[in-house]
Structures are given as structure tokens and as C-alpha cells.
UniProtKB/Swiss-Prot annotation:
This is Small ribosomal subunit protein uS19. Belongs to the universal ribosomal protein uS19 family. The gene is rpsS. GO terms for cellular component: cytoplasm; small ribosomal subunit. HAMAP family: Ribosomal_uS19.
Length: 92
């Protein structure tokens, strides 16, 4: 479901603060964030965020195509190791 227009996009206040500080300083360090639910705004384009996936911070470089999506979409939390193979084919 899409968030209603009158509410506007959700962005953590601390995240906005960190992004503004990074823009003002001109440094391009990785900004560590834990807010996977925050929406990517146009002012974040060009910055690199370390999005926490439960184990580590995954670096996400924001580009124009990502605007409007959530940070959590670009930092997978689960790894798929494949389904169990056929025991008959492994035995022979």
C-alpha cells in the first residue's frame, strides 16, 4: 500500500540531520543509519549510507532511481542458501 499524499514521506529526523551535516561539510563518508523505514529523498542523491541489516551496515550509494523507495529495500536481511538437493544424485 502506498502512503497517502497528505501525510508526506516518512524520514527519521536524525537521518535528515546527518545528511544535512554531510552535505554542509562536503565530506563523502559513509553515514551509518538504522532507520530502514525512512524514505529516500532527492536531497540524499550522491550520498552513501550504511544501512543496518541486523548484522552489519551495508553501504548504499543513493542515485536518482532510488528516490521514493525505502532504505531497507537496498539492504537485504536474509541470505538464501538454496533448497536441499536430491539425495539420490549426490550419492552416486
Amino acid at each position: 500500500m502506498v502512503r497517502s499524499v497528505w501525510k508526506g514521506p516518512f524520514v527519521e529526523a536524525s537521518l535528515l540531520k546527518k545528511a544535512d551535516a554531510a552535505r554542509a561539510s562536503g565530506r563523502h563518508d559513509v553515514i551509518k543509519i538504522w532507520s530502514r523505514r525512512s524514505t529516500i529523498l532527492p536531497q540524499f542523491v550522491g550520498l552513501t549510507f550504511g544501512v543496518y541489516n541486523g548484522q552489519k551496515h551495508v553501504p548504499v550509494s543513493v542515485n536518482e532511481e532510488m528516490v521514493g523507495h525505502k532504505f531497507g529495500e537496498f539492504s537485504p536481511t536474509r541470505t538464501f542458501h538454496g533448497h536441499a538437493g536430491d539425495k539420490k544424485s549426490k550419492k552416486g
